């Protein structure tokens, strides 16, 4: 029984997901439905958390919009997510960057990873 479930989940997983880590700046393009129209919307920010659970994997992206912090959780293999592009690599030493929620301005900056 579990082999069938694993096989079905494997078929539904996206193959073109780039590798990214917490601290990286990513641009996620998401399909948005407004009335009868369907369009792509970009959400660019810093990855503050990743949850690896196979088909149920998710990641949290944080950005500052009009001086207000906005966080959005994306399901990695969701059909709503069109593409994920890594804009900048960040050098951090923690897996969850929740401390960035309390920081603003220059204190919330992340060093760039050079390799």
UniProtKB/Swiss-Prot annotation:
InterPro entries: Ribosomal_bL19, Ribosomal_bL19_CS, Ribosomal_bL19_sf, Translation_prot_SH3-like_sf. Keywords: Ribonucleoprotein, Ribosomal protein. GO terms for cellular component: cytosolic large ribosomal subunit. Transmembrane segments: none annotated. One of its GO terms (biological process) is translation. It comes from the Bacteria. This protein is located at the 30S-50S ribosomal subunit interface and may play a role in the structure and function of the aminoacyl-tRNA binding site. PANTHER family: LARGE RIBOSOMAL SUBUNIT PROTEIN BL19M (PTHR15680:SF9), RIBOSOMAL PROTEIN L19 (PTHR15680). Belongs to the bacterial ribosomal protein bL19 family. This is Large ribosomal subunit protein bL19. It comes from Citrobacter koseri (strain ATCC BAA-895 / CDC 4225-83 / SGSC4696). The lineage of its organism: Bacteria, Pseudomonadati, Pseudomonadota, Gammaproteobacteria, Enterobacterales.
